[in-house]
């Protein structure tokens, strides 16, 4: 129902689940219990370790159904798919050139 009764005592951020609050608290404590066995880099969340480990293995489990290009992160696939649908919702206020991703616009804007 939108209730968020679990409140972080450090920053006041509210959560609807106690486990999410516990995970959030690691930001304040600096706790990083998940360690990469390859390089020793540490992470707050297991999911972040799993994604990081792909840099060592080269695994790219997310494949574009349009062109077959593969990505290590789902978010990178989603960004890539904009190339195929042609959507360009970010426009440069200086010259009007349009881009599919905010990051591309930011990079372009530096030339002005």
Swiss-Prot record:
The keyword Transcription regulation applies. One of its GO terms (molecular function) is DNA-binding transcription factor activity, RNA polymerase II-specific. It is found in: Nucleus. Keywords: DNA-binding, Metal-binding, Nucleus, Repeat, Transcription, Transcription regulation, Zinc, Zinc-finger. InterPro entries: Znf_C2H2_sf (IPR036236), Znf_C2H2_type (IPR013087). PANTHER family: C2H2-TYPE DOMAIN-CONTAINING PROTEIN-RELATED (PTHR23235:SF178), KRUEPPEL-LIKE TRANSCRIPTION FACTOR (PTHR23235). May be involved in transcriptional regulation. This is Gastrula zinc finger protein XlCGF9.1. The lineage of its organism: Eukaryota, Metazoa, Chordata, Craniata, Vertebrata.
